[in-house]
């Protein structure tokens, strides 16, 4: 199903009080979403890993840009067949007119999806589709041979190559450039399986701006 109106949630997490306004993503209910965006201090935009940037995504970003609202992007459905992650990053920058910086990175996609490397925390988050959750968090040196014991030699080498390219192409993440809405951190995962969501939340509570008083 789809959301047809904004839902409000409040919860405590890691010593922080988090207020979430879950807005409709479908364009038929865009007015409610745009109105809600005027009341938030930061936004998380969910992008379908197969469809990429859609018309509604562009409109949401326009509102965030007008209000100078910091944005985090969550690329969803990595456990399904989809687009190349680097192509998605290029599209995000070109279509949303904002620089991006991946803070997690998928290890394969679709049926071969094994998890993500959490760049922000330097951890390997492994995914088992039969259990539909993070089954193991591993602190492993990306250059260590131990990496291959967890994800296989081929995927280990591909991950090393991808992370090297990321470090070469994208600037090191700086919190202030995010808070000033110049850079959008990007996370990958599968919301349906609750995979990658906690990693995003762990980062969000540390970097998102505190609520500002409304006028």
Predicted regions mapped to residue ranges:
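Structural and coupling elements of P-loop NTPases
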Residues: 1-215
């Amino acid at each position: 199903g789809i959301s047809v109106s904004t839902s409000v949630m409040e919860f405590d997490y890691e010593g922080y009080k988090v207020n979430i306004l879950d807005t409709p993503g479908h364009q038929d209910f865009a007015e409610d979403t745009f109105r809600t965006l005027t009341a938030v201090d930061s936004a998380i935009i969910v992008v379908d890993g197969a469809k990429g940037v859609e018309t509604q995504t562009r409109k949401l970003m326009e509102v965030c840009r007008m209000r100078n609202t910091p944005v985090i992007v969550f690329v969803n459905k990595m456990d399904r067949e989809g687009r190349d992650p680097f192509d998605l990053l290029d599209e995000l920058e070109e279509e949303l007119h904002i620089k991006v910086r991946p803070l997690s990175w998928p290890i394969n996609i679709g049926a071969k999806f094994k998890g993500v490397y959490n760049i922000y925390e330097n951890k390997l988050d492994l995914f088992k589709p039969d259990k539909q959750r993070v089954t193991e968090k591993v602190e492993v040196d990306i250059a260590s041979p131990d990496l291959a014991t967890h994800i296989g030699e081929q995927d280990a080498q591909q991950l090393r190559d991808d992370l090297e390219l990321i470090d070469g192409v994208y600037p090191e993440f700086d919190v202030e450039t995010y808070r000033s809405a110049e850079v959008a951190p990007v996370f990958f995962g599968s919301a349906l399986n609750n995979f990658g969501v906690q990693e995003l939340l762990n980062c969000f509570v540390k970097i998102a701006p505190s609520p500002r008083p409304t006028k």
